[in-house]
Swiss-Prot record:
<dbReference type="GO" id="GO:0051287">
    <property type="term" value="F:NAD binding"/>
</dbReference>
<keyword id="KW-0443">Lipid metabolism</keyword>
<feature type="binding site">
    <location>
        <begin position="110"/>
        <end position="111"/>
    </location>
    <ligand>
        <name>NAD(+)</name>
    </ligand>
</feature>
<dbReference type="InterPro" id="IPR010758">
    <property type="entry name" value="Trans-2-enoyl-CoA_reductase"/>
</dbReference>
<protein>
    <recommendedName>
        <fullName>Enoyl-[acyl-carrier-protein] reductase [NADH]</fullName>
        <ecNumber>1.3.1.9</ecNumber>
    </recommendedName>
</protein>
<comment type="similarity">
    <text>Belongs to the TER reductase family.</text>
</comment>
<comment type="subunit">
    <text>Monomer.</text>
</comment>
<keyword id="KW-0520">NAD</keyword>
<keyword id="KW-0276">Fatty acid metabolism</keyword>
<dbReference type="InterPro" id="IPR024906">
    <property type="entry name" value="Eno_Rdtase_FAD-bd_dom"/>
</dbReference>
<comment type="function">
    <text>Involved in the final reduction of the elongation cycle of fatty acid synthesis (FAS II). Catalyzes the reduction of a carbon-carbon double bond in an enoyl moiety that is covalently linked to an acyl carrier protein (ACP).</text>
</comment>
<feature type="active site" description="Proton donor">
    <location>
        <position position="234"/>
    </location>
</feature>
<keyword id="KW-0444">Lipid biosynthesis</keyword>
<dbReference type="Pfam" id="PF12241">
    <property type="entry name" value="Enoyl_reductase"/>
</dbReference>
<feature type="site" description="Plays an important role in discriminating NADH against NADPH">
    <location>
        <position position="74"/>
    </location>
</feature>
<dbReference type="GO" id="GO:0004318">
    <property type="term" value="F:enoyl-[acyl-carrier-protein] reductase (NADH) activity"/>
</dbReference>
<dbReference type="GO" id="GO:0050343">
    <property type="term" value="F:trans-2-enoyl-CoA reductase (NADH) activity"/>
</dbReference>
Length: 396
């Protein structure tokens, strides 16, 4: 079939297999161009099919020649409807790993469930014995707690009072004021249950108990802080409470990993265009301005540049891993530079529907958004007939 982007609000309902494949190949080529990282050898990536999780899997495999197991929840094509982008990303990753002679297997299912944890542990035991790195990069809006059976839904709301600020419809370039009503206590509890560190802890407990963590194993989860500009809706809102919980969980997990001399870290990453960030009011406008400033400074990074730098300059230097006072790894350091933030704040004051195309990188934002779904990718013929029914090699 010929596949075109179909939009509904902040979601693209279609994805392109060839575009997703080219995206993955581009990321692999970037990692290879940066040279070998003396990194992990056996890696589990929980949330391995898109964004930072996919970038972690690619960096592990093609930067350090690591065997990887990826866990995700994606949909194959059905009756004239393409599969999800993460499905096609994984098809491409598995094919490229096979060509390179690198072990890679994948599990498609609910990572929050006990069954998927057990299936993953069984696969590690059978094929790898143990893993030396566990990346935790889940981005789901809903979680059913396997112990209580309660289904929690996360919300993106401020805490303590309504919040009003500028936002942009990145499809039209219309800049307007948005007001978000505050969260109640239940909203906070649910968001922490979905996006906090409880499930990360459950994964590490299960793996420790099963003996599948190698001595000196590291686990890393991803977080975001961001500037004062976005804090009401992000870091001081419901999602920020979840990130606080995630960051606190790193210390708890590190305590438990002492028996294998392991350590848990949270890496604070930069703001990027993802399906999740596109749905948060205010954030797309902030990112469009940030991109403009960082590109002008020559310090713009996407997911793969961020994670390659995390591995090469932070995790695997052979020296102690540098962290902030809270023990967090900071690869948002370029985004949070004083000059960068001052420039973004100045542009924020000026931005309107009339000048947004000139003073922000809305074009780059849109392009990155379409790229998530395999569209607007260079070297791809979108008029060509494409087979949407492709299977994932190495799916367990």
């Amino acid at each position: 079939m010929i596949i075109e982007p179909k939009m509904r609000g902040f979601i693209c309902l279609t994805s392109h297999p060839t575009g997703c494949e080219q995206n993955v190949i581009n990321q692999i080529n970037y990692v290879k161009s940066k040279g070998v990282i003396n990194g992990p050898k056996k890696v589990l990536v929980i949330g391995a099919s898109t964004g930072f999780g996919l970038a972690s899997r690619i960096t592990s495999a093609f930067g350090s020649n690591a065997a990887t197991i990826g866990v995700f929840f994606e949909k194959p094509a059905q009756e004239g409807k393409p599969g999800s982008p993460g499905w096609y990303n994984t098809v491409a990753f598995q094919n490229e790993a096979k060509k390179a002679g690198i072990y890679a297997k994948s599990i498609n299912g609910d990572a929050f469930s006990t069954e998927v944890k057990q299936k993953t542990i069984d696969l590690i035991k059978a094929d790898l014995g143990q893993v030396d790195l566990v990346i935790y990069s889940l981005a789901s809006p809903v979680r059913t707690n396997p112990v209580t059976g309660v289904t929690h839904r996360s919300v993106l709301k401020p805490i303590g009072g309504a919040f009003s600020n500028k936002t942009v419809d990145f499809h039209t370039g219309n800049v307007s004021t948005v007001t978000i009503e505050p969260a109640n206590e239940e909203d906070v509890t649910n968001t922490v249950a979905v996006m906090g560190g409880e499930d990360w802890g459950m994964w590490m407990d299960a793996m420790l108990e099963a003996g599948v963590l190698a001595e000196g194993a590291t686990t890393v989860a991803y977080s975001y802080i961001g500037p004062a500009l976005t804090e009401a809706v992000y870091r001081k809102g419901t999602i920020g409470r979840a990130k606080d919980h995630l960051e606190a969980s790193a210390a708890t997990i590190t305590d438990k990993l002492k028996s294998v001399k392991g350590k848990a870290y949270v890496s604070v990453n930069k703001a990027l265009v993802t399906q999740a960030s596109s749905a948060i009011p205010v954030i797309p406008l902030y990112i469009s301005l940030l991109y403009k400033v960082m590109k002008a400074e020559g310090i713009h990074e996407g997911c793969i540049e961020q994670i390659q730098r995390l591995y090469a300059d932070r995790l695997y230097t052979g020296k102690a891993i540098p962290t902030d006072e809270q023990g967090r790894i900071r690869i948002d350091d370029w985004e949070m530079r004083e000059d960068v933030q001052a420039n973004v704040a100045a542009l924020w004051e000026q931005v309107t529907s009339e000048n947004v195309s000139d003073i922000s990188d809305l074009k780059g934002y849109k392009n990155d958004f379409l790229n998530l779904f395999g569209f607007a990718v260079n070297k791809v013929d979108y008029l060509a007939d494409v087979n949407e029914n492709v299977t994932i090699e190495g799916l367990v």
